[in-house]
Amino acid sequence: ERRRLLKALSLNLSDISLNERNMCDLELLATGVFSPLDRFMDRSDYESVLDRMRLQNGTLWPLPIALDVSETTARSLEVGQSVTLRDPEGFLLAVLHIDDIWPVDREKEALSVYGTTDDTHPGVHYLYHRSGDYYVGGAVEVLSPPLRFDFRQNRLSPLEVRAMYRKLGWKRVVGFQTRHPIHRP
C-alpha cells in the first residue's frame, strides 16, 4: 500500500538523477549493507563521522554517506521537501525526505577520509572534481533498488549472507579489508 502511494506521489515530486556512486550508496542502504545506517546522513552525522568516526549516537562509522548534488539542484531543494531519486535513465528508485542540505567542505572531508588533500589520490580527485557542491541528507524509502546485471551471484543482502553461512554450517567468519581497498566509482 505504501509503495503504491509513493509511486502516485512521485508523479508530483521534483527529481534528482543519481550518478553511479550515489546509486551504489542507495543500493547499500536499501539492502541493509550499511545497517544500522538507513538514510543519507544529515550534517550532524556527517560532521561527527569526519571528526570522530562515529555517528551522533556513538555507533562506529568510518565514512560519510551523503547524497551529493550540484549547487543548482541544492538551491531548488528545501528541508522538509520530498523528492524522487532516479537512475540516469529516469527509472524511479526511491523517495528521499530531505532533513538537511549543506555545502561540502572538500578539504576537511579529504583530510578526514583520505588523510590527504593530494589531488593525485583517486578519492580526493573524485571529491574535488566530480562530487557535487552540496550534500543532502534524509530518510529514503526505496521503491526499487538500482538494477544490476553484473556479478549477480555476489550481490547478496546481509540476510542472504547469513542464510548462506547457515547452509554451509559456518559458525565463525573473518572479515578482511585490504590495505588499499577498491575505490568506489
Predicted regions and their residues:
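Non-catalytic terminal extensions that flank enzyme cores
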Residues: 1-185
